[in-house]
Amino acid sequence: MPRKGPVAKRDVLPDPIYNSKLVTRLINRVMVDGKRGIAANIIYNSFDIIKESTGNDPLEVFEQAMKNVMPVLEVKARRVGGSNYQVPVEVRPERRTTLGLRWVVNYARLRGEHTMEERLAKEIMDAANNTGASVKKREDTHKMADANRAFAHYRW
């Protein structure tokens, strides 16, 4: 905890092609070892693949995918009287976006396609259609929260 009060949240600049802050955050999530140019090329090439495959605007497909992946509830461990409970809590909007991006990129990396552009494009298209590993992760998170609804009164 810093002594001078809370740290100001840094604002990300919208990307130059799609003029979207969400795309910039996706580029930052894909970036490895500070190589932003390579990450941006991966994103833009995968958006081109999405445009060719679906014929729709890739930004709209990506935003729909994010809506389908972002969790509403999650569980947090809470220690009460010597035992740990998984307490369901609502997810803040900023964290929802962060988790959604993290899951899409992580599960795209685990896919079997040849290049990262193809993997990311397929994962985004699957998420937009409510299928794929990242949507399953969201469903599993919601199931965990639903299963532990009995401990909701331990919320803080």
UniProtKB/Swiss-Prot annotation:
Family to which the UniProt record says this protein belongs: Belongs to the universal ribosomal protein uS7 family.
SUPFAM superfamilies: Ribosomal protein S7
A single Gene Ontology CC term: small ribosomal subunit
Source domain of life: Bacteria
Database matches in InterPro entries: Ribosomal_uS7, Ribosomal_uS7_bac/org-type, Ribosomal_uS7_CS, Ribosomal_uS7_dom, Ribosomal_uS7_dom_sf
The keyword RNA-binding appears for this protein: yes
Protein name: Small ribosomal subunit protein uS7
Task performed by this protein: One of the primary rRNA binding proteins, it binds directly to 16S rRNA where it nucleates assembly of the head domain of the 30S subunit. Is located at the subunit interface close to the decoding center, probably blocks exit of the E-site tRNA.
Family matches, as HAMAP family: Ribosomal_uS7_B
GO process annotations (BP): translation
Subunit structure: Part of the 30S ribosomal subunit. Contacts proteins S9 and S11.
Keyword hit for Hydrolase: no
Keywords: Ribonucleoprotein, Ribosomal protein, RNA-binding, rRNA-binding, tRNA-binding
GO molecular function annotation: rRNA binding; structural constituent of ribosome; tRNA binding
Pfam families: Ribosomal_S7
